[in-house]
Amino acid sequence: MSDTVYVLDQVGIRLVKEKTLISDTQLKRPEQVVGFVSDILREYDREVMCVICLNAKLNPVNMCICSMGAVDKAIASPREIMKTAILSNANGFIILHNHPGGSSQPSLEDIHVTDVMSKAGELLGIPLYDHIIAAAGSDEIYSFYEKGSMPQSQLKYADRVADINLRSD
């Protein structure tokens, strides 16, 4: 009989808050979301994807930059996006990214990411309400929700999107 003693590290996850990014500015439309977050996105010369987590009242809980890419693409890991939503105890989320090239039209990869994130959110019970693309150097945006391009599985959430209140308390 062996007297081997096993030592296991106990691990824990803690939410560490950084500087406040959301103010009391009321944001109800994709243009307002982009306008508010554009100051953050303007700092980058490459594609940046962020996630805005929402609570049960559809108010923002937080915002996290979950991917930084190259000039023409950002690798959006569903794991990183959903980790932010789960750790924030979010009831839903919006993803937003910029297109430094100046066009807000979604690429095939953007459409794929929207579909994957919609399915991941549905599986975890944290719905994706919108994916917004902001073109650099202009006010041009593309909202998958407003264009009716959200995946079919998300249509059951569509009635709640109009109630999203992107204003912090």
Describe every region a protein language model picked out:
Residues 28:
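Extended substrate/RNA-proximal surfaces in nucleic-acid metabolism proteins
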Residues 42-45:
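Short loop/turn motifs at secondary-structure junctions and domain boundaries
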Residues 48-49, 129:
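Short loop/turn microsegments at loop-to-beta-strand junctions
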Residues 162-169:
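A cross-taxonomic marker for long C-terminal extensions/tails that follow the last structured domain
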Residues 1-15, 19-23, 32-35, 55-57, ...:
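Active-site-proximal loop/helix of nucleotide/amide-processing enzymes and allied scaffolds
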